Every structure is written in structure tokens, then in C-alpha cells.
């Protein structure tokens, strides 16, 4: 079985890659240049993890201290810049990659918070924050309303994945199994919400701008 440190690194780097793809592809769609694509890739890939590490006192943040995070984001950005037409053939690629990154980071964030001694409630909330941070940074840099502030199930999916991790830890279940279950639950809920139009309620009588 992998150690907690190894598992966190794997989930962090995988989440970094898929979130970088979502950021880079969103940048390509806005016709940003190569530098802009790489900036969006890095911001989407690492913002959530940097915020997580700063909040729990893991300094310097892993995304800054470990060259692999920047390298993974750069590779994802370059791949997207040169092969965007191939990636666009997937159905809703930005949202699919975003859902995958959301799931991986929510799980990794909750696990790292637990490893730093945070209580279960705060660990679950920090896992959610880790998951939504990259998408928020991407959307804000593109002057979009962040997905997490819209009605669709975004933060809720991240929170579900983080809660599964926290509960699994409390029950003493194998961390690898719990991580996979949490990430899968988050990803499935997010994709189902997109496919079926599941949304949180909005204020009655609110006008669309």
C-alpha cells in the first residue's frame, strides 16, 4: 500500500495536470497567446493547493517548493496550446477536466489537512476549498463568474469527496481505497449535475442579468 506522502503527491500531481488542462483550454478559447495559456494553466492547477498549504502552515507551498508542479502545469499548457483541436473533440472538455481536478484536489486537500492534525470538520472544508480554488482562479482571470458561485453543484461535489475521506479516516479504512471512493463520488456527482441540470436553489424572483 502506498504511504500517505506518496498518495498525496500522486493525487496532487494528477489534479495539477487536469486542472492545468482546463485552464489552458479555457485560455485557448479566449484566444490568449502562449504566455497567457501558460499563466492560466499554472493558476488553475496550483491556486487551490497554494491556498491549502498556506492555511495549514505547510510553507513554502508544495506548488512553489517542488519543481514538478510547475513542470506538470507547463506540459499541460503546451499540450493544450498545440493540440487544442484534438482536445476539443471531447464533449465539454473544460468541464470534464475541471470535474476531474475538483475530485482529485478535494481528496488530496482533505487528506493533507488530516495529516497536519486538523479536526474532521475543518479538514473537510479545507478539502472543498482546495478543490474549488483552481477553478475560481481560472474563471476570475478570464473575468467569468466562478462556477462555484453559480447554481450548479460544484462546491457540494467537492465537499462530498472530502467528507468521504474524513469519514474513512475516522473509521480506519485504507487511505488508498478511501481516496479513490471520495474522488469517484465527487467526479460522478459533478458530471451528473452537469448532464442532468441539477442545481442549488436561487432566490425566488431573482432576475437573470
Where in this protein do the model-derived segments appear?
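Helix-coil boundary and interhelical linker segments in multi-pass alpha-helical membrane proteins
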Residues: 1-7, 54-64, 108-122, 167-178
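Cytoplasmic-side transmembrane-helix entry/capping segments in multi-pass membrane proteins
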Residues: 35-43, 66-71, 91-102, 124-126, ...
Amino acid at each position: 500500500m502506498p504511504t500517505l506522502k506518496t498518495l498525496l503527491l500522486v493525487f496532487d500531481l494528477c489534479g495539477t495536470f487536469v486542472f492545468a488542462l482546463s485552464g489552458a483550454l479555457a485560455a485557448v478559447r479566449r484566444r490568449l497567446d502562449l504566455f497567457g495559456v501558460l499563466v492560466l494553466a499554472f493558476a488553475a492547477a496550483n491556486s487551490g493547493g497554494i491556498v491549502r498549504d498556506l492555511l495549514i502552515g505547510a510553507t513554502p507551498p508544495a506548488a512553489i517548493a517542488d519543481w514538478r508542479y510547475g513542470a506538470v502545469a507547463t506540459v499541460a499548457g503546451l499540450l493544450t496550446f498545440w493540440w487544442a483541436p484534438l482536445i476539443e473533440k471531447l464533449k465539454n472538455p473544460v468541464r470534464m477536466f475541471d470535474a476531474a481536478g475538483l475530485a482529485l484536489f478535494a481528496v488530496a486537500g482533505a487528506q493533507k489537512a488530516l495529516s497536519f492534525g486538523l479536526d474532521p470538520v475543518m479538514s473537510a472544508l479545507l478539502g472543498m476549498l482546495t478543490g474549488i480554488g483552481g477553478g475560481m482562479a481560472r474563471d476570475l482571470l478570464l473575468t467569468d463568474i466562478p462556477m462555484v458561485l453559480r447554481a450548479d453543484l460544484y462546491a457540494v461535489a467537492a465537499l462530498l469527496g472530502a467528507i468521504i475521506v474524513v469519514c474513512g479516516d475516522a473509521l480506519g479504512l485504507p487511505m488508498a481505497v478511501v481516496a479513490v471512493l471520495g474522488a469517484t463520488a465527487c467526479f460522478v456527482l459533478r458530471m451528473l449535475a452537469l448532464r442532468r441540470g441539477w442545481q442549488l436553489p436561487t432566490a425566488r424572483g431573482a432576475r437573470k442579468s
